[in-house]
């Protein structure tokens, strides 16, 4: 069956073969069409931008305690300063409405404790993975692990250790002339994090494709209220 839809000089005709034709009876109808077309194009571009924009947040664990030298390094807890710094970063995440779809956490106690503090404020990730292999991993081991994560996850929070976090950001990013990179490259302090964006189709394409967008240290933020 044929179908015709008309509105104020603008009509759409569809024949039995599903062929569409557009008619404009006056200039205003053409303007309406052009506006709708441009709006759709902007919407389509925005959707495509989001589809291929991936975000990786690389965070170093908060400050840990050295009081008990008999404790194995893997089991060292956070000290008071570390807990306060992790809380400040959590408040920053909450204020900026950051959401992480996948959390990849070293299973050392200080990294797990850092994530536990963050979890009190941020939305729960769709998937959280604790990995002992991250504890002594270099940046290439972590990259290979990230590459295996499904492209359905567009944002990843990684909490790990130095010097791996710094080396990872160095390797993945290409805008090394920025102040953010220079700060990060000078020192990646405890509880600091780097935000990296990738214009890619999947995590298997991340090598040297990232743009460092933020590098935030606890001392850059206002003190939390106790």
Regions flagged by a language model, labelled:
Residues 133-171:
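Internal catalytic or translocation cores that form aromatic/hydrophobic pockets or channels
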Residues 1-29, 33, 37-42:
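Low-acidity, Ser/Thr- and Arg-rich intrinsically disordered low-complexity segments
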């Amino acid at each position: 069956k044929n179908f015709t839809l008309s509105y104020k000089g603008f009509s759409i005709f569809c024949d039995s073969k599903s062929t569409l034709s557009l008619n404009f009876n006056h200039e205003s109808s053409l303007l309406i069409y052009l506006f709708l077309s441009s709006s759709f194009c902007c919407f389509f571009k925005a959707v495509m931008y989001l589809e291929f924009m991936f975000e990786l947040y690389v965070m170093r664990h908060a400050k840990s305690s050295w009081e008990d030298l008999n404790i194995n390094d893997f089991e060292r807890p956070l000290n008071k300063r570390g807990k306060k710094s992790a809380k400040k970063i959590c408040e920053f995440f909450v204020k900026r409405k950051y959401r992480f779809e996948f959390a990849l956490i070293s299973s050392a106690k200080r990294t797990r404790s850092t994530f536990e503090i963050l979890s009190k404020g941020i939305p729960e990730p769709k998937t959280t993975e604790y990995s002992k292999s991250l504890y002594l991993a270099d940046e290439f081991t972590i990259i290979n692990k990230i590459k295996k994560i499904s492209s359905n996850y567009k944002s990843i929070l990684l909490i790990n250790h130095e010097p791996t976090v710094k080396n990872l950001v160095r390797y993945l990013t290409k805008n090394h002339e920025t102040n953010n990179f220079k700060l990060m490259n000078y020192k990646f302090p405890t509880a600091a994090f780097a935000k990296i964006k990738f214009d890619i189709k999947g995590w298997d394409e991340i090598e040297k494709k990232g743009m460092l967008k933020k590098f935030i240290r606890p001392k850059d933020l206002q003190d939390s209220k106790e």
